[in-house]
Amino acid sequence: MRQLYYTFRTLLRGRGVNLTKIISLTLGLLVGILLFARVAFELSFDGHYKEVDRLCVINAVYYVGGEKGEAHQVVLAPVPGAIAEGVPDEIESSTVVRIRYGDNTLFYNNVRQCPKMILSDSLFFKTMGIDIISGDPRELVNPETMFVSRSFARRIFGDESPIGKTLLYNRTLPMTIKGVYEDIPENSSLYHEVVISFSTIEKHHWECMGWECGDSFQGYIRLKNASDLDKVNSRIDPIIEKHLPFRPEEGFAIRYSLQPIRGVHASAPVIQKMVMIMSLLGLVILFIAAMNYVLISISSLARRAKAIGVHKCNGASERNIFSMFLWETGIIIMISLILVGVLVLNFREDIEYLASASIGALFTWETLWVPICVIVILFIVAGIIPGHLFSSIPVTHVFRNYTERKGGWKRTLLFLQFTGVTFVLGILCVVLLQYNRITTKPIGYNPEGVAFTYHNFADSESALDNLRRLPMVSDVSDSESSIISGYGGLAVTDENGIILFTTRLNACLYNYVPFMGIRIKEGRNLNGPDQALVNEEFVRQMRWTDGAVGKKYENFTIVGVMENFPVNSYYEEQDPVAFIGQQQINNCYHVRLKQPYEENLRSLNKSMEEMYPTEDIVFKSLSYSIEDQYQNVRRFRDAVMLAFVVILLISLMGLIGYISDEIQRRSKEIAIRKVNGAEVSHILNLLSKDIIWTASPAVLFGTAGAYFVGIQWLGQFAERISLQVYWFVLIAIVVLAMIFLSAVIKVWHIANENPVKSIKSE
């Protein structure tokens, strides 16, 4: 207790220094804990299912044009059932899933809900290992039935039982709730709030579900024993070949295999790169915060030496002094943690936006060990190093010039801080430049003012006429898919029937290409049936060097070549594209609005509600949809920006503390030099020389690290910037300039001070 009492007295005496420590640790802990919590969130994906080691997802590897592709979690609808039937001794159950993308809505009492939906069969919950709260999963055999999650049921019905209630799917199709299941956590690759019966697809002909088409499903297998995985994989090929012969020499073939679901998300290259970079940022920030704490503690040695000497003269052992420093560090960390909690509560929405996850999902009982480990490691580093240094000082040395021998320690800590600042600034610049590239590069069409919606009208021509007559609409068109949806795939063959590649295919009205502002580089636009437009990539892969106009594609005549444009995003390579002209389509309606766009979009949706009160028709902005494709990059940019600001503040506090300590330690020397004629510039050079010598190699290491990590991060983009060495030279110059200016500003006052004051105070 006596040690704790002396610790509190010491903390109260050094309020200014301790405030700096608290601010530094608060910032470091806040960002560091959040970064590592996000890493743990990503690495714990799909770990919530019962006996998850026995649950596998079916991977498909496509062989197109003689080339083996990457594994994808997509299957033909009959595949899971066929595998389960073929290996009954090792497989407990199987299920097939279709994810409903886009704005799928449910209405209850005329209130619109947009939950995450999937379609699956009666074995879904058994296979996945999801608890049923009420209802019989066998009800999913029947079409137009559904199960809902606990939280969705509570949100819609409160404490009332949802069983037997009817919801309107997309405001037109009644569906009956037959059961409730436990909530799916956010760190799930198959997140859903509603499960609709798979037989609904067949009844309403939503999808093709045979062996010849419809590879847009997901398949899951639950093994009886996890050790049977290799045995099952070895028997899959002959089972599938009974229905789908494997003939890669014909240009197209598929191989299926099982993979434990727990490793699918974490093994994705994009996730691995993100985890690596976030872990590096977290380590850098926490390490810098800890080193800054150590630096400030060591810098206070001159002020605290006599107090330590007095304690030792009064019988305090090295262990007593050491424990006092541990108590001091523990109290400061506790205060910092309280402030971290206050910041999290007050900036909850911003933090959840940056983390792409709720606070509750980031800090679960399963991942609580992550922040605990961060705190413990920080306590060990920040407490043990200065505690050991102070407690090991002999009494005979306490009142001498012991602090002068700590210059190496302090310069090493400064070196690490400067390295961290440069590294994070380099990463930030790479992210900013890449984000600017993918958001400002011309995309090959004009999305400005365009809004779209998916809907099947009773009369498509009448719907188009109604849209044209609206005062806020300047033009309308229609297509099978939106321009950023990726479209469906169709094999392109040569004259011998060998598949060369798969093209992205979209059907559209004749005015769609000029409506979207797509540039035609060769030929003309569509103006009749049996005509097609292809893009430059299509022509390149066909190896047509003599032009494409007039050539045949399937039963269509190519009348023009479009300039390349992304059909997904700049994450993916440019695909070959073909547009087929049709006189009438009834699926994805497009309008080009007059200015002001946002106001007119609201007016458009209000008009649609008035014209079609019994249907769910909501247009959304194409420009905003394109921006949403890069939401993860934008969030990562903001997170790195926050990390840079935090690490810069921490490092500046450490630098200022170091300079203050040097000024205090060498004040008499500076005064004597000034009395002997030293100018201000000489004093500035005296105090800043060591800092620049420390900073220069640190900045070099930081920029080199940022360069190599930046290359790794850019690997996820098909369209990416080319890193230039001179960018990193400029970054190094900027960091050195910031360090030098900070040092000059801090030293300027003492360099101009009357030397008599310093000599009198000695």
What are these regions (language model features)?
Residues 1-4, 9-19, 49, 237-284, ...:
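Membrane-helix entry/capping segments
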Residues 6-12, 16, 291-332, 392-403, ...:
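Intracellular coupling helices
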Residues 13-41, 271-306, 334, 338, ...:
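Hydrophobic alpha-helical transmembrane segments of multi-pass inner-membrane transport and secretion
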Residues 34, 241-243, 329-392, 433, ...:
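Small-residue-rich transmembrane alpha-helices
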